[in-house]
Amino acid sequence: MNWLKSTLSAVAGTQEPIYGPEAIQPVSQQQTEDAPYTELTKHDLRWRAYQYTNVETQTYYAMADNGTLVMVQIIYSNIAGIHTTAQFNCKIFNTSGDGTPHIWFSDPLYNHMFDESMSSFAADNISLSLNEEGNAYTLKSAVNEGCLVDLTFNRAAPGFAIGKDGTTYFGTDPQNPWGSMRHMFWPRCNVTGTITTKEKVHDMTGRGMFSQALQGMKPHHAASRWNFINFQTPSFSAIMMEFTTPPSYGSTVVNVGGIAKDGEIIYAGTTNSATHTEASQDETSDWPEPKSIKWVWEGKTKDGKTVTAEVDGPLGPKLDRIDVMAEVPGFIKTIAGSVAGARPYIFQYSPQQKLSLKLKVGDEEFTEEGSMFSEATFIS
């Protein structure tokens, strides 16, 4: 019956047994003293399109000089090698707090395909292309006539993945992992272009970041909690992605993050933390909604200087609380819906009372106000 149980849990998302922390190989194990991270090449950025259960996402966050905050995302998912779907999401946040709903579009994509090098993606009325030099993505979408997207993200600092390949592996046999979680980042981008809605043309000239993720397993098997921050100041970009595994993998915390400036990664590594310093119980979701978070980065530059950085302070009123089960496409929901005890909610923030990045590199100290987008996700 065990094979049936594990197959069922892979496809239907039932709970996993307790394997313990030995059954996870965090990405930090790939780091060496002289190679804590890898600078990304064009080849690293290719879509994988694996033929087993996995979800691949390319997510672009834009913070326009005029204050507009946007997330655009392509999701490519394969369920048990039998069903492939692609989805395009675009969210224009209302940061004014006046109660006007965010502009949110989520559309299935049809006839999707990749170019020969697997670095560009297309489907009916949408294309995402990586240029020849591998330093700019252009996204054009007319999938939904209510939201016409024409954006270019130019890499302003090198991209990075932690260790050799940015991947945490799951499984009791490290040589044959049964699951994985990978992240790659362009922490600092210059954004140009527009998003046209029925109401107006949004000029998106400004700053941004790009995150590529690949979950080679059921999302709720890999993580029970997530914390994410994208913090952009005139001179620096600070990003962090942290997840905590369910008890089946020892409630292990995996944290990847980095700090960049134009042309340079100052630090990238795993010795970072995200601490919810204040929270209150959210009645709708029954999760402890964070009110204040302290983000800390600690490590060394390439040439051995000590780096410490923090962003700390009140998050202000949340932008949004997303009931994931209400949002996900139907097919994925039926597969995820049988999860015992999973109640996935995402809380999103962008403090309008701006917070500051405090950064110390060697003996030099910097403090700069910045634009922030962050998420706290609770799953189980």
Curated annotation (Swiss-Prot):
The keyword Nucleus applies. Coiled coil: none annotated. GO terms for molecular function: ceramide binding. Its main location: Golgi. GO terms for biological process: ER to Golgi ceramide transport; response to oxidative stress. It comes from the Eukaryota. Belongs to the SVF1 family. This is Ceramide-binding protein svf1. It comes from Emericella nidulans (strain FGSC A4 / ATCC 38163 / CBS 112.46 / NRRL 194 / M139).
